[in-house]
Amino acid sequence: MLQFPREDYRLHVGWRTIKTAITAMLVAVVYCLLERNPAFACIGVIFGLGTDMPDSIKNGGNRLFGTLIGGLLAIAVFWVYLRFYPQGGHSMLLALLLGAAIVVLILLCQYFWPGGVQPGGVVLCIVLFSTPVETYVAYSLNRIFDTAVGVIVALLVNYFLPRERVVAFWEK
C-alpha cells in the first residue's frame, strides 16, 4: 500500500541530482545564448539522466524515440488535415484524425520503441492542437531536434561522469 510520507525517505542531494541540475542549466544557458527556447532540450536532459547508463538509455530513448515518432506522425496527420482545411480551424476533424493517429503511434512504438508511446502522444497532441498551420513542420522538427540534443547531452554526461568514476576520482 502506498504510504505518504514514505518512512524510508531521507533527504539528500546525490550525484545524479547534481548532474541533472548542472546539465539542464548548461543546456539552458547554451540555448539562451543561441536565442532558442531551451524547454524541450532541458526536458530531454531530465529524461535522459537516469540512475545509470542502462536506465539513461531506456528513459532517454523513450523520450527521444517517442518525440521522433510522435513528431513525424504529427507532420503527416497535419498534412492530411490541411488537404481538407488549408486555413485550419476545424478541430473536430483534428480530433477524429487524432484517434487514428494514436492507433498508428502505438503500433509504431510497439515495433520500434515501446516506451515511446507517452512522450510521442504528448508531442502529437501539442502539434495537432496548439501549433499554427504555418509552422507545424518547423515546430515538429525543432521539438525532435531539441529533445535529441537534451537526451544526447544527458547520455554523454552519464557516460563520462558515472558515479563510480567520480567516486574513484575523489578517493585518489
Model regions and ranges:
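Alpha-helical transmembrane segments and their membrane-interface boundaries
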Residues: 1-124, 129-172
